[in-house]
């Protein structure tokens, strides 16, 4: 919470979290739709989510994402709007802050590129490109 340019929105179940610093509260869907694109990126430094849906939502809104290694499953780490913080660096506030700033600088200028990338996570594409081929392979192997 010591990064001044970082704002927090969402559920807060941790009593150690200081809600007096940059905490925006839990947003309703209406607030989310209205405000999300006012930000440059989403930062999720979590060790409990492998494929966080909030990242897909952020990408579809044109926001870059900054995640830990744990939250990077299925993300293309070669994209400049996807920043992966190594576990060994999560506690290095200066490093994390610099990565957030670099990601934000790129992301605000490349929203359309980010939105295009996010389309691969659309359910229509996931079903067509992932699920149907898997089912077809299972069916063909069982013959």
PLM feature spans:
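Short alpha-helical segment that forms part of, or immediately flanks, the ligand-binding pocket
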Residues: 33, 56-60, 74-75
């Amino acid at each position: 919470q010591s990064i001044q340019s970082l704002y927090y929105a969402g559920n807060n179940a941790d009593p150690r979290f200081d809600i007096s610093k940059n905490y925006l509260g839990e947003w309703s869907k209406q607030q989310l739709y209205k405000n999300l694109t006012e930000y440059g990126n989403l930062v999720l430094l979590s060790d409990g989510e492998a494929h966080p849906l909030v990242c897909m939502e952020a990408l579809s809104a044109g926001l870059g994402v900054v995640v830990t290694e744990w939250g990077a499953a299925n993300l293309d780490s070669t994209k400049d709007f996807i920043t992966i913080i190594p576990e060994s660096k999560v506690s290095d506030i200066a490093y994390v802050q610099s990565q957030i700033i670099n990601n934000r600088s790129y992301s605000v200028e490349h929203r359309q590129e980010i939105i295009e990338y996010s389309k691969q996570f659309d359910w229509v594409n996931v079903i067509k490109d992932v699920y149907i081929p898997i089912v077809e392979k299972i069916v063909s192997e069982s013959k």
